[in-house]
């Protein structure tokens, strides 16, 4: 292996480098967020990345917080991710700023970073002032709540704290104060609501000011979490220069905004919006409502925002009064529509579809109703408190072509920096299909199964896609928010639901419940954020107490249905001919899932220095793995369980197969795949991530590559052959066409073909071992880390690697630091 190091800056004079350090810090984060205005703690953590033109190790750092709150002084440490604040005690509502500089191994120091803002939100025992208010209850109406006030002078700083049960949107003096949509993020609304803080300083003026908050029920409905009031509620507080100035109370007025939501927000019940253009509210005093038992805490993930505005690829006049709009691909979006001048009261029905243009089913993708105002220039309609999954839009009762129509694609506003491309266009197409799907499903602070039919944060779907999404994007804050909903939805006896938030009962099994453990551990591996483990470890252990209740003779058995959870699934959504209802298969899958939980909890306990529990979890894992082999292995056939792909690969992944039997079980897996399944994938939601992880760890890239390349049903290429533009819910194209069932394959592109395997939390240490399927000429992969992007480009037997400062990579037994490395790598 010959090695060449490439430095893009070229040769730099030693004298110049001594005077001007060629490294700097960038991408500063507080609690994983960029300049957050309201974190949920008085002890923040700071992170930064370092760009360097030369080989570098951070030897020391210095952090300042507002100069006098904390001056760390020079701290000799390589730590640059989640560095804890150690200064004077911070207070609720306190706004501060921080900066950092670093030294390298040659004792050169960088320039100070620019000052970065952060704020402590409203944290206990402090509480948000004001009362919950609402207006125009019933019939799904979205109220507009307003209050005028006069200022003699403008403040230096104005912060508006808003806590809504349901969604809200704020405007001040005619301007929206944020680009966020569907605010706040989701939470377990019968236990926790979220506070969002806005800096509204620039929107204020001397004299009369008008503050309006529009609100929509969203998930706050009698049919979901139950409600105190038949409509959304808002509590808000405006602070000027650190002092309370205005709160929501009986002095506010409310009226109907012209928006109404008629859906139940149960399965198939998301409906859409009825929008009356140019509606003038009939102002009346608001209702002041008392809300009990719902904790209000700061939102700790990025908001949901519009990422792009998509134009249609065609607008077709399909009848005298109907238009069919095709956006070319399925998308999770809000619809923007500008209609021509129409008579006042004219009704334009709008239908959405994710697949067939001639079968737009409102039961799946919903429908809107737009009622025109009669203004000569025509009306503009835009979804406000709902959204749709669609490729096709049909407009009825419209003779003229719409003036403008766009899809406002939205998601949680996380950085998305992962990328993949290779010499095989089939693989590129599969990757792009998965990438597009998970990006569209990660919105509002969680990841849903589908955004059209159920819109639930299923744990099974979450487990299936966690590694995929975390390889593709920096979603640490999203997982913090989502895992908080899981902990909040835990029952007093330790039982967990299958979805979180948990508005009503939904189907699944133990693999779904295990999301609390698996997602927390995998997030720690991806982002080195120990808070996740510290915060949710008690809930994980409590869930195991519940599991013990249903453990018989060393094996987990079926537990009962409850009002918050139903079914006891093994795999789900497998191809036709694979019996996921086989009782032995269900028990095998669920006990293998429990093995994964014990392995993860052992590692979590070690990180938290709970060594006694770590030993206990290891012992329980070993006992369960032995029982799985004893009970589910059939010596005569050499099979486990039903002999399905999942029943063979899951025991292999969790180490339940004795080492002496592994070759024969692998041979049976491959042989049965070839003969029984014609070389196709033959598994479902649980099986795809399990098979992917096993193939990655076992370096079975040729075999998995062959499965992916197999045309016809079932498979990803089949979806593409049939015109799919998102991953389907079922292999045959049933139900949703933008779904989270089969996205677990995404991690294979990064960890197998790119060969980027973490060996320390936060990817601080990695092993780079690209796997090379026969016939795949080249691969280029970029995987972002808390330290910066890692890029791997393999072309034939040569390898180029880009490693950020702070990361060390092991490649064929040699250790490499930051820089651009060009290797002749003999596979």
Which residues make up each language-model segment?
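Extracellular/oxidizing-compartment recognition motifs
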Residues: 23-451, 477-478, 497-501, 531
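Bacterial N-terminal signal peptides that target proteins for export
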Residues: 1-8
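C-terminal capping/lid segments that line or modulate ligand- or cofactor-binding pockets
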Residues: 211, 264-276, 453-454, 472, ...
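Non-catalytic C-terminal accessory modules of carbohydrate-active enzymes
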Residues: 230-237, 251-277, 290, 297-309, ...
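Active-site acid/base region of carbohydrate-active enzymes
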Residues: 167, 233, 247-255, 402-433, ...
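Alpha-helical support elements that line or immediately flank enzyme active sites
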Residues: 158-162, 172, 333-352, 460-489, ...
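C-terminal motif of bacterial Sec signal peptides marking the signal peptidase cleavage site
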Residues: 17-18
């Amino acid at each position: 292996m010959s090695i060449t190091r490439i430095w893009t800056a070229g040769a730099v004079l030693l004298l110049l480098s001594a005077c001007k350090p060629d490294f700097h810090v960038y991408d500063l984060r507080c609690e994983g967020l960029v300049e957050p205005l309201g974190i949920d703690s008085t002890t923040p953590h700071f992170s930064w990345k370092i760009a360097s033109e030369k080989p570098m190790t951070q030897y020391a750092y210095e952090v300042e917080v507002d100069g006098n709150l904390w001056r760390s002084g020079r701290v000799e440490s390589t730590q640059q991710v989640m560095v804890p604040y150690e200064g004077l005690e911070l207070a609720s509502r306190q706004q501060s700023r921080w900066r950092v500089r670093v030294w390298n191994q040659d004792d050169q120091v960088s320039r100070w970073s620019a000052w970065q803002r952060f704020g402590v939100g409203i944290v206990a025992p402090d509480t948000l002032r004001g009362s919950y208010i609402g207006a125009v209850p019933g019939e799904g109406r979205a109220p507009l709540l307003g209050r005028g006030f006069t200022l003699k002078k403008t403040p230096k700083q104005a912060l508006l704290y808003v806590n809504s049960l349901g969604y809200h949107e704020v405007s001040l003096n005619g301007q929206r104060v944020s680009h966020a949509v569907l605010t706040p993020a989701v939470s377990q609304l019968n236990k926790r609501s979220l506070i969002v803080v806005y800096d509204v300083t620039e929107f204020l003026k001397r004299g009369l000011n008008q503050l309006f908050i529009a609100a929509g029920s969203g998930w706050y409905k009698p049919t979901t979490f139950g409600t105190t009031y038949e409509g959304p509620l808002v509590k808000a507080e405006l602070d000027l220069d650190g002092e309370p100035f205005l709160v929501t109370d009986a002095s506010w007025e409310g009226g109907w905004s012209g928006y109404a939501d008629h859906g139940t927000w149960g399965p198939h019940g998301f409906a859409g919006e009825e929008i009356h253009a140019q509606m003038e509210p009939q102002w009346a005093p608001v209702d002041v409502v008392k809300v009990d038992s719902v904790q209000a805490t700061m939102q700790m993930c990025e908001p949901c925002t519009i990422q792009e505005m998509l134009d249609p690829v065609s607008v077709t006049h399909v009848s005298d009064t109907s238009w069919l709009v095709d956006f070319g691909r399925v998308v999770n979006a809000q619809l923007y529509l500008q209609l021509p001048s129409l008579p006042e009261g004219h009704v334009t029905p709008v239908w959405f579809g994710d697949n067939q243009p001639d079968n737009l089913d409102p039961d799946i993708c919903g429908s809107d109703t737009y009622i025109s105002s009669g203004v000569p220039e025509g009306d503009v309609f835009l979804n406000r408190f709902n959204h749709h999954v669609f490729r096709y839009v049909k407009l009825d009762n419209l003779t003229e072509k719409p003036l403008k129509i766009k899809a406002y694609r939205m998601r949680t506003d996380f950085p998305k920096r992962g990328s993949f491309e290779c010499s095989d266009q089939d693989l590129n197409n599969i990757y792009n299909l998965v990438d597009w799907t998970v990006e569209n499903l990660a919105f509002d602070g969680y990841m849903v199964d589908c955004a059209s039919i159920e819109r639930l944060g299923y744990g099974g779907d979450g487990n299936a896609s966690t590694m995929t999404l975390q390889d593709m994007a920096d979603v640490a804050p999203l997982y913090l928010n989502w895992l908080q909903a899981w902990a909040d939805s835990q029952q007093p006896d330790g039982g967990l639901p299958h979805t979180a938030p948990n508005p009503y009962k939904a189907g699944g099994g133990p693999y779904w419940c295990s999301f609390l453990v698996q997602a927390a551990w995998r997030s720690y591996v991806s982002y080195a954020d120990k808070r996740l483990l510290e915060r949710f470890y008690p809930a994980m252990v409590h869930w195991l107490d519940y599991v013990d209740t249903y453990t018989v003779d060393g094996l987990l058995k079926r537990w009962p249905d409850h009002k918050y959870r139903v079914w006891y699934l093994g795999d789900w959504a497998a191809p036709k001919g694979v019996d996921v209802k086989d009782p032995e298969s269900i028990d095998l899958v669920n006990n293998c899932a429990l093995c994964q939980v014990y392995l993860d909890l052992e590692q979590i306990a070690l990180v938290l220095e709970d060594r006694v529990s770590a030993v206990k979890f290891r012992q329980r894992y070993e006992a369960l793995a032995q029982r799985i082999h004893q009970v589910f292995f059939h010596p005569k056939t050499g099979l486990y369980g039903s002999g399905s792909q999942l029943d063979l690969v899951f025991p292999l992944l969790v180490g339940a197969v004795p080492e002496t039997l592994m070759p024969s079980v692998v041979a049976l897996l491959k042989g049965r795949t070839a003969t029984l399944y014609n070389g196709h994938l033959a598994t479902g939601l649980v099986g795809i991530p399990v098979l992917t992880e096993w193939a990655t760890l076992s370096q079975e890239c040729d075999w998995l590559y062959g499965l992916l390349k197999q045309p016809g049903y079932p498979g990803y290429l089949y979806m593409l052959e049939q015109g799919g533009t998102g991953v389907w819910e079922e292999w045959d194209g049933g139900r949703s066409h933008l779904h989270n069932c089969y996205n677990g394959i995404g991690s294979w592109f990064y960890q197998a073909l790119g060969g980027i395997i973490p060996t320390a939390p936060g990817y601080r240490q990695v092993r780079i071992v690209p796997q090379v399927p026969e016939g795949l000429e080249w691969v280029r992969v970029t995987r972002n880390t808390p330290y910066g992007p890692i890029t791997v480009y393999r072309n034939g037997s040569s390898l180029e690697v880009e490693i950020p400062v702070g990361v060390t990579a092991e490649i064929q037994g040699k250790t490499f630091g930051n820089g651009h490395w060009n290797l002749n790598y003999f596979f």
